[in-house]
Amino acid sequence: MSNKLVKEKRVDQADLAWLTDPEVYEVNTIPPHSDHESFQSQEELEEGKSSLVQSLDGDWLIDYAENGQGPVNFYAEDFDDSNFKSVKVPGNLELQGFGQPQYVNVQYPWDGSEEIFPPQIPSKNPLASYVRYFDLDEAFWDKEVSLKFDGAATAIYVWLNGHFVGYGEDSFTPSEFMVTKFLKKENNRLAVALYKYSSASWLEDQDFWRMSGLFRSVTLQAKPRLHLEDLKLTASLTDNYQKGKLEVEANIAYRLPNASFKLEVRDSEGDLVAEKLGPIRSEQLEFTLADLPVAAWSAEKPNLYQVRLYLYQAGSLLEVSRQEVGFRNFELKDGIMYLNGQRIVFKGANRHEFDSKLGRAITEEDMIWDIKTMKRSNINAVRCSHYPNQSLFYRLCDKYGLYVIDEANLESHGTWEKVGGHEDPSFNVPGDDQHWLGASLSRVKNMMARDKNHASILIWSLGNESYAGTVFAQMADYVRKADPTRVQHYEGVTHNRKFDDATQIESRMYAPAKVIEEYLTNKPAKPFISVEYAHAMGNSVGDLAAYTALEKYPHYQGGFIWDWIDQGLEKDGHLLYGGDFDDRPTDYEFCGNGLVFADRTESPKLANVKALYANLKLEVKDGQLFLKNDNLFTNSSSYYFLTSLLVDGKLTYQSRPLTFGLEPGESGTFALPWPEVADEKGEVVYRVTAHLKEDLPWADEGFTVAEAEEVAQKLPEFKPEGRPDLVDSDYNLGLKGNNFQILFSKVKGWPVSLKYAGREYLKRLPEFTFWRALTDNDRGAGYGYDLARWENAGKYARLKDISCEVKEDSVLVKTAFTLPVALKGDLTVTYEVDGRGKIAVTADFPGAEEAGLLPAFGLNLALPKELTDYRYYGLGPNESYPDRLEGNYLGIYQGAVKKNFSPYLRPQETGNRSKVRWYQLFDEKGGLEFTANGADLNLSALPYSAAQIEAADHAFELTNNYTWVRALSAQMGVGGDDSWGQKVHPEFCLDAQKARQLRLVIQPLLLK
């Protein structure tokens, strides 16, 4: 049975054969339509509560059959469902005890369990039999009524009061059915058979948790005898973007005489901008309002207008509908995309709908947090990867100002990409198979019909990672003809250039910046966007600056970082990843790619993004401000600027608010007011910050949007103060002074005791470290294999020599070691100790004989775990690495040591602070201070060692026995072009053959 035949007549009986028929994807559904809101009165409209909508959300009854063998005839009115359990709608079944969540990326969930090919489905196909009892609201009694499922995964059969209603697929757009003739005023029984798998599952192979259920709202929609079925509003700009034009196309259910309408356009204050009145003589209402006095919509200035359409019969209001619109022009000219005449750069992120507790049943609170945090992080665009989101999300993007790529629910990644990235499209769908055209095209149509009125949506995307073929070419043709006001996108053609015309954008995933530059400098025909880039898995997003530097090329129009939020599911207070639910096959921690953690707290990566995505580019040089205004529509005078002077990390001066007026796209140099600073005062930081001048929906007045600083560097140098007493015994060297004692083992070659005021600070022998707990990117790049020789090299260093030398104001203890790795000379550590207990440590690495990379070089110290607090002067407040310094600034920062551990889904290298001048660890009794000695110092203080972190699969497995200090001369970058092969960029790597030196001073921290 083809879907064409299904649509020609009403089908009264369900058929399980539909589950495996790609040509049957909707049965008895009504045509998709706009997501406008309708009300029965003016009062309802103003309150925002409609009596024409009845929610069926809440507690439903359910029988869950893992094997797909559910109760027979459960949909019958007289069926006994007293043994059914309770389930929440909206909600994912697997998070409510029905089945288990499963995380896979490319592979299908059944891979290795059954050998099946499209459109076959697994023999084990879980079935959820849902039941909901309800009484019909009185406002519905005299109206036509539809039943709408906003999101259901994956295939649903629907019955009402024993009557078959219809069938739906496409998990992420509504399935809506007319149910008027089946309804009763009271005691209605709605039954839904939801199957986890159908032929549609081959088109829904997105990189996410595979979960099922009624995960979006279920509602009844009442339709008065005069009813707005569909509304298309094309809001554009004319007269050099100074005036507005509104083209109105309304489809009205017209069943009454003497019908009329009134259309109003109102601004954000509710004031009338324009109106149109007239009779209704047919189901189609079309007209244009021109020369409207409107302000343009953009992400910078999201000016919205409310269109209200009133429907009357003989002068009585039967229905009023509303839709927010933004007037804007989005155009593709000469291979470049323009918004309202300005070349646009997308500073974007990909975003899954995800909540760590609720799965895909996310809340309005989740959405608002995401959007506000994006705006505060200078993110101006979001790609709905890889399916249409809830309608509310687009309304919020319209309101707060985000540019959107809306993407059809279509991904068949596992049908063509095989192990190791090998491509084999032999059973790729939809490909060239016309049996899949209807289902594929319906997904695009459903999305466009629902979302067409949202100003925030600039680009329609056909889907994700599904290769290419004639079906996509047909889809692209439909999109461009149906909506010439937007640009059409599809990245999959990069794998089959025969279908290059199926996208208007040159879109690539994870292309290195140098590869992109080659395209941009060779007569590009299309605009370029990195639709996925800077893979943010774990400790990542290194060298994002290489990509933002491409903005100088007109055809480079930005990109979308993968991705926004870690997909970690919470259970028993812990965040878990693939495999933790005994789900197999699985792709484990690959679901942890977020700029924010799964609990919606910000990761350190986000500060880097905020700095590099800023529309105000600031540079302080020679005391002057170099300012570039990359906004498209906002003068820099809309912000105020502050200059601040810091000496040794302490604020000594701050200016009054300053204003610098640059039009969008302009650059300028401005003299700044600075007080005189004597050279001997210390290290001086000249800082400029840019702030919001007024409250905005996403941040308050004074919020910092950008900053920059110039440092007149002055690193501390060790100067000994008096000589300690020396006790040179057979097995140990002892050094004593005023209230301190240090003991060096002549056998081990390390200090074995460090006491200040009688307190022991060394809990274990120090060790050399050349390693770090592997990051997700390290694992993906193969560094665990390539650099394995360094993992335990420091642990097994062998003492070659130890000696001491008495100097006038200090005592030198010199040690030399060999490693199980061939070096160009001895590995040495020199300790210069003065009479006050200060220890200047100098560790020299001579370089390895064999070429290769060195992860890090420095020392590990195990200190008392009671040292729970830190305070330091260096780059902060976040962890930083040589390829991810942006967004951190010199200052004095403090907090709890445990907070230095970033909770990546799988534990890995974390907590490093760069350009440290001094670092204090303490409790109420005192502590230690580590100070740079004439050279940059990297330092981390954590409750766990690198070895513990490396061995752990989850943070909750770690135990805190000591406070671990890693003092490093250098550490390689974290990388981030991708997480499955790309190496850290060479300029951020450490050459193992190069000599390195660590210099720092350790001294007691005395608290008053």
From Swiss-Prot:
Top-level enzyme category: hydrolase
InterPro entries the record matches: B-gal_small/dom_5, Bact_Beta-galactosidase, Beta-gal/glucu_dom_sf, Gal_mutarotase_sf_dom, Galactose-bd-like_sf, GH-type_carb-bd, Glyco_hydro_2, Glyco_hydro_2_AS
One GO location term (cellular component): beta-galactosidase complex
Reaction catalysis annotation: Hydrolysis of terminal non-reducing beta-D-galactose residues in beta-D-galactosides
EC number: 3.2.1.23
One annotated GO molecular function: carbohydrate binding
Region span, Disordered: 29-48
Keywords: Glycosidase, Hydrolase
Catalytic site positions: E465, E532
Keyword Glycoprotein in annotation: no
GO biological-process terms attached to the record: lactose catabolic process
Subunit-structure text: Monomer.
Family of this protein: Belongs to the glycosyl hydrolase 2 family.
Name of the protein in question: Beta-galactosidase
